[in-house]
Each structure stands twice: as C-alpha cells, then as structure tokens.
Amino acid sequence: MARAACLLRAISRALLLPLPLLLLLLLLLPPQLMARARPPENHRHRPVKRVPQLLPAALPNSLPSVPASHWVPGPASSSRPLRCGVPDPPDVLNARNRQKRFVLSGGRWEKTDLTYRILRFPWQLVREQVRQTVAEALRVWSEVTPLTFTEVHEGRADIMIDFTRYWHGDNLPFDGPGGILAHAFFPKTHREGDVHFDYDETWTIGDKGTDLLQVAAHEFGHVLGLQHTTAAKALMSPFYTFRYPLSLSPDDRRGIQHLYGRPQLTPTSPTPTLSSQAGTDTNEIALQEPEVPPEVCETSFDAVSTIRGELFFFKAGFVWRLRSGQLQPGYPALASRHWQGLPSPVDAAFEDAQGQIWFFQGAQYWVYDGEKPVLGPAPLSKLGLQGSPVHAALVWGPEKNKIYFFRGGDYWRFHPRTQRVDNPVPRRTTDWRGVPSEIDAAFQDAEGYAYFLRGHLYWKFDPVKVKVLESFPRPIGPDFFDCAEPANTFR
C-alpha cells in the first residue's frame, strides 16, 4: 500500500493535479481498462500453427514458366537431406506407382541433334574445365540414346547455359551462396532449353564444394524432358548426393530411352568386307552403310496414319511427321525412335479410339500404347484374316469406330470391341466410288475426309457424297511436302 501511495503522489505531481482529484478520475475509469490483458481461455494453451512457406515454383499460375528444377542444399551441419527444391509431381510420391518410376515432363525434343552454348562461366574454374565438364554431363545422356550435342559459340542454341546471379530475367532469382544451386526448363515450355546456375556458389570438380558435373547432369535430364523419380540412386532423384563415378541408374536409362530410344549402332572401325573368294568361310561381317531416308518428293509410301492428331508417313523404316500441315524438325527419322521393336517396313498403321497404335507387316501385327509395346507379333488369323498381308488401314467416323482393312481390290470392316473382322469374306473396293482398286495407304483428316494413296498420287473421298471429289487424284509431294509441282499434274 505504501508503494501504491508513493506512486499516486508521483503521478499527481507529474500531472499537476491534486491527489483527491486524481483518485476521483481513477474511480470513474471503465473496469476493462483497469484489468490485466489475458488470452481467451480456449487459446491459452493451444500451440501456434506454422504455415509452411512454399517456393515460388510451387504456386500455380504464379510464374510464366515453371522451371524443371532448383537444386537446394541444406547447411553442412543439417540432418535434412539436400534436394531439388521444386515440388515433385504427385505421381513421384504415389506409393502405388512402383513399376514405372521415371516421370516425364510431357515434352521432348523433336530432333536428336542438339546444340548448346555456354554464355558465362563461374569464376572458380577455368573455361576449359567448364567446357569439359558440361560435355561430360551431356555425354551421360548421349551414350544411351541417339542424341548428339554440339557446342556452338554464337547465336541461339537449343540448350543455353548461363552462370548468373540473383534476378536474371526469369522471375526465379538466385539467393547467393547456398540455397538454390540451379534450375532448368523443360522442352515445349516458354524457356525450353535454358539452364541457369547460381554464379555465387562454390563450383568445383569433385566433392570439395558444389560438384558442377553432378548438378549439370541432373539439370540436363530436365532439359531433355525428365521429371524427378523416387528410384534409389537415380540421377533424377530430387535428393542431391555426390556420387563417383557419375552414371545413370536403370531408372534414368529407361526414362530417357522411353523418350528418345536406344543409341544407333555405327561402326567405329574401318568397315570389314566379305572375302571375294567363293566358298571361303569367314567370320568377317560386311556392315551396311547407315541408311538414308528416300527422297520424299520422289517416293511412294508404305503406310500413313493420323496419330495423336498428327500425320505420320511411313517408308522403308523411316517416318515423316506433319503437325498442322508442317513437317516437324528432326524428321524424317527412324520409326524405331518412337516404337522400339517395330519391323521395317510396315504395310499399314492406324490409331484406335483408345489411343492404341496398330502396325501390320506381312501376316503379323503389333499394338503399342503410345510408344510402349503391348502386343505382338501376333498372327492376322487372330483378327479373322487369312492369306496375304493388309495393304492399308482406314479409321473412319468421328468416334473412330469404323475401321477398314484393304488388300488388293478387297476390304473388310474390323470391330475393335470383338477384335475380329465382321465377315471373313471381303467386299469389293468398288463400293468406294472413285477409289482405285489397289491402294498403298489410307487415313482420315480432322474434317472427316478419307484419303487413299497409291504410288505418287492420292484421292480425297467425301463422306457425305460417298465418292471421290472432283479434281482428284493429286500428287502427294506438292500437297503434303511442298515439292515442286510436276509438269503432268492431274487436275
């Protein structure tokens, strides 16, 4: 009480108020102001929830282009494993997704010969060291695929490599030493092929700092179209671990070969030749020169099919790929680049309503789910067909529920549900008014017109009038591949 009285007298002197008047004012104050603040009962012992902080790349629609990866190391003393900082795709952490571990980004390069350019270099390493390390990191991928990588020193390259700092033009700033090490962008994105390394990291060759080889090889995997994987010891694992020597895991290899196929074997020594002496046994093998695709303006085609909305022309083991009427870069290419184990040449091809792709050769057929083989070789007799091969296959109708097989002057209707032709006795192609009696290939366009190819010519069939349009046949080369118009054009 004595202490309170002293305090009141001090306040009274400070405010120049008589003590009785000060006591009166205190009695008139509301009781809420005189009570000590205390938390509500239901919050007193409740722990504070901490909201996790998401990386910018984890926020949907927050950036113009989502990068393929950020390598994020923790402090050396931390027990948390070092990892790539971009959130993993949901399937990567799905416990049910065990058989196929590798995850694709949804994009891939449409050619196999890629160029790269290094714009700026880290200060810790001489330029030649960086060039050798980048080449070695790319070689990890080229050794198991048909991909090749060539360094260029000016202009725009397919893969642009840069060592940069903080804000550098892609809304994904670096953060100085530690933290984010690098990021890369997938194919078919706004910044496809860009690979950025944080200039402020301690870049080294080996485990005495941040190993450039390990990080570069991982980022190049993203640039080629691979996402993260949960497979143990995979280079594309989101967790950063120094490994020596650097190599791909079986999961990495399966993923990249799913996108680009296996490497093409070429002789590395002078080509051996067979002995010219008749009857002489020899174990020398005469290796053929690498095949070259036929001249598109001068060839006929073995098969044509609309696959995933794009037009594929097949000839002698090669394929031409047209999207919106334009031949895509990197084509013609070997058909085995997309469909491993596919025989050459194919006689016919079509895509059914479920997206499965059927190929025919001789008395057998194969079925692929995208680029994954699911059936074959299987005999044509399984489909109710006997005798000689199918020459052409046509998917007709908006729902892809009408499939026709052509052979010579005959045709059959095939039912995907029963996996059989409706009648083993064929009908005559004269039912298709104006179509030649024998055809090489057939397909349907997005507007419902059917096309029949024979030799260098094609016929366009009207589904409403049920006959070939006037002014046909037309030459294939000028209309599909911008070849010069022949002098004897059919009009």
Curated annotation (Swiss-Prot):
Q: Cofactor(s) for this protein?
A: Ca(2+); Zn(2+)
> Which amino acids does the record list as binding Zn(2+) 1?
H168, D170, H183, H196
**Induction data:** In skin fibroblasts of superficial dermis upon skin lesion with highest level between days 5-10.
Task: Respond yes or no to whether keyword Ribonucleoprotein is given for this record.
Answer: no
Question: Motif range for Cysteine switch?
Answer: 82-89
Cell compartment(s), UniProt: Secreted, Extracellular space, Extracellular matrix
Q: Which InterPro entries match?
A: Hemopexin-like_dom, Hemopexin-like_dom_sf, Hemopexin-like_repeat, Hemopexin_CS, M10A_MMP, MetalloPept_cat_dom_sf, Pept_M10_metallopeptidase, Pept_M10A
Q: Where is the composition biased (Low complexity)?
A: 263-277
Provide the alphabetized UniProt keywords: Calcium, Cleavage on pair of basic residues, Collagen degradation, Disulfide bond, Extracellular matrix, Hydrolase, Metal-binding, Metalloprotease, Protease, Repeat, Secreted, Signal, Zinc, Zymogen
Q: Where is the active site?
A: E219
What GO annotations for molecular function exist for this entry? metalloendopeptidase activity; metallopeptidase activity; zinc ion binding
Entry EC no(s): 3.4.24.-
Q: Which Pfam families match?
A: Hemopexin, Peptidase_M10
What does the note under cofactor report? Binds 1 Ca(2+) ion per subunit. Binds 2 Zn(2+) ions per subunit.
Domain of life where this protein originates: Eukaryota
Question: Metal-binding among the record's keywords?
Answer: yes
Q: Where is this region: Disordered?
A: 260-279
> Binding positions for Zn(2+) 2?
C84, H218, H222, H228
Q: Using the chain's own numbering, where are the disulfide bonds?
A: C297-C483
Question: Which residues does the record give as Ca(2+) binding sites?
Answer: D175, G176, G178, I180
Q: Which family does it belong to?
A: Belongs to the peptidase M10A family.
Domain text: The conserved cysteine present in the cysteine-switch motif binds the catalytic zinc ion, thus inhibiting the enzyme. The dissociation of the cysteine from the zinc ion upon the activation-peptide release activates the enzyme.
Q: What does the UniProt record say this protein does?
A: May play an important role in the progression of epithelial malignancies.
The protein in question is named: Stromelysin-3
Organism for this UniProt entry: Rattus norvegicus
What taxonomic lineage is listed for the species of origin? Eukaryota, Metazoa, Chordata, Craniata, Vertebrata
